[in-house]
């Protein structure tokens, strides 16, 4: 049977379609390291890989298996830029900041694709993305975005799609218009996790699964991490837990909020050549976004139905099927072979959160749905910062990310009320 993550619900199609998932041991006792990393997703594994290649003694631990969180269970879409469009960011932070954040995200895109190519990791990259509008009133915003990106931001890969083109490229009349992006694409996220873990191990990183961090503190000149298998004493540490931070570190927990998102995978869509004939991924304009794409073998992978509490739907497939049928009524009876969920780490402004939470301890997360690119790149940037090679990560440290209101006790309830209001607005 497909592996069931103990921290994320459902059985993932990604898990079922990787040829072999390496197993790493539980940490065999207390140890010392130059750098300790908590979290075996994209950020942590990239940091470990890059540090180990430079001769750093690095120890990485994960409470479960690598990729059990968002890195191995997400929608697989790269996107372009940050989670918030660059022209919208410009209105808040100004032109220079918007450009720098956009350039960082584009660097991230190139880095991930280059890393996979360099190390012959078959991530099943498929080009293209369609961002589609569910309200006719949003057309001017979409047109303005294309003009801004192809103009002052110098990104030539966007084009506006009218209703006829949108219907043709989606195989559905559900949306009014859209934007086609030929400069991005989508991947099999778990294959990237597996390939990355193997590269980190080959580089000499000490990788441990099934080893949970219980406490992190500064003692004298060292960072001390208490775990279920002993203590790690390190010169510095990276917290790369994102939406799975729990109560480990309060600053991260107050700024990065986990929300649940769910995905279903259908059987291969024989007899439906009209659905996404170009193979692009799709995201829509709803606040509670729907995102979907075809796999290389022709399945529809459909994501949506966010949840803002720890509760999960009893039948993930039923929730996903209802949303599929709104867009593709002819798929009412299609078999959903796998359905799963996981936690996405978001911040209030939907920008990444990077902060030194105590001397020598950095936390990175809150990618807000753009982690396939950004999490990998931020792991690399952390390694470069630790090695004194680059300060590009400081760009994110300077962002003023506010804490969520209500503290850890009431923030879920407050966010549920606020986002339920936005979800209601999606319908009108």
Swiss-Prot record:
Q: Which domain of life is it from?
A: Bacteria
Family matches, as InterPro entries? FAD-dep_OxRdtase, FAD/NAD-bd_sf
**Enzyme type, top EC level:** oxidoreductase
Would the keyword Oxidoreductase turn up in this protein's UniProt record?
Answer: yes
* EC number per UniProt: 1.-.-.-
Keywords per UniProt: NAD, Oxidoreductase
Q: Which GO terms describe its molecular function?
A: oxidoreductase activity
A GO-annotated cellular component? cytoplasm
The record's Gene3D superfamilies line, in alphabetical order, gives: D-Amino Acid Oxidase, subunit A, domain 2, FAD/NAD(P)-binding domain
Q: Which Pfam families match?
A: DAO
Q: Which PANTHER family match?
A: FAD DEPENDENT OXIDOREDUCTASE DOMAIN-CONTAINING PROTEIN, SARCOSINE DEHYDROGENASE-RELATED
Protein name in the entry? Probable oxidoreductase OrdL
Record the organism. Rhizobium meliloti (strain 1021) (Ensifer meliloti)
């Amino acid at each position: 049977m497909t592996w069931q993550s103990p921290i994320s619900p459902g059985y993932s199609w990604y898990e079922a379609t990787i040829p072999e998932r390496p197993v790493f041991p539980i940490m065999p006792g207390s140890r010392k390291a130059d750098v300790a990393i908590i979290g075996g997703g994209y950020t942590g594994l990239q940091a470990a890989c890059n540090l180990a290649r430079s001769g750093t003694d690095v120890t990485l631990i994960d409470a479960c298996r690598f990729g059990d969180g968002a890195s191995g269970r997400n929608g697989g879409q790269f996107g372009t830029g940050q989670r918030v469009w660059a022209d919208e960011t410009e209105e808040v932070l100004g032109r220079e900041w918007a450009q720098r954040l956009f350039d960082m995200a584009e660097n991230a895109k190139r880095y991930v694709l280059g890393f996979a190519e360099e190390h012959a990791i078959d991530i099943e990259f498929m080009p293209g993305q369609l961002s589609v509008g569910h309200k006719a009133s949003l057309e001017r915003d979409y047109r303005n975005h294309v003009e801004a990106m192809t103009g002052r931001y110098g990104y030539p890969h966007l084009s506006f799609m009218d209703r006829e083109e949108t219907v043709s490229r989606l195989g559905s009349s559900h949306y009014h218009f859209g934007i086609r992006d030929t400069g991005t694409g989508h991947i099999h996220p778990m294959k990237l996790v597996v390939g990355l873990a193997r590269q980190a191990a080959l580089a000499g990183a000490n990788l441990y699964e099934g080893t949970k961090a219980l406490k992190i503190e500064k003692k004298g000149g060292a960072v001390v991490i208490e775990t279920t298998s002993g203590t790690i004493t390190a010169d510095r540490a990276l917290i790369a837990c994102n939406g799975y931070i729990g109560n480990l570190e309060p600053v991260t927990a107050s700024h990065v909020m986990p929300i649940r998102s769910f995905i279903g995978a259908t059987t291969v869509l024989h007899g439906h050549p009209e659905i996404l004939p170009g193979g692009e991924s799709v995201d829509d304009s709803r606040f509670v976004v729907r995102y979907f794409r075809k796999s290389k073998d022709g399945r529809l992978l459909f994501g949506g139905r966010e949840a803002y509490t720890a509760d999960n739907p009893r039948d993930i497939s039923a929730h996903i099927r209802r949303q599929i049928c709104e867009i593709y009524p002819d798929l009412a009876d299609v078999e959903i072979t796998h359905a799963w969920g996981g936690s996405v780490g978001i911040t209030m402004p939907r920008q990444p959160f990077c902060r030194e939470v105590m001397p020598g301890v950095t936390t990175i997360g809150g990618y807000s749905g753009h982690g396939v690119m950004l999490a990998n790149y931020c792991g690399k940037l952390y390694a470069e910062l630790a090695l004194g090679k680059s300060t590009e990560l400081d760009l994110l440290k300077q962002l003023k990310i506010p804490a969520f209101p209500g503290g850890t006790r009431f923030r879920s309830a407050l966010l549920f009320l606020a986002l339920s209001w936005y979800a209601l607005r999606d319908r009108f």
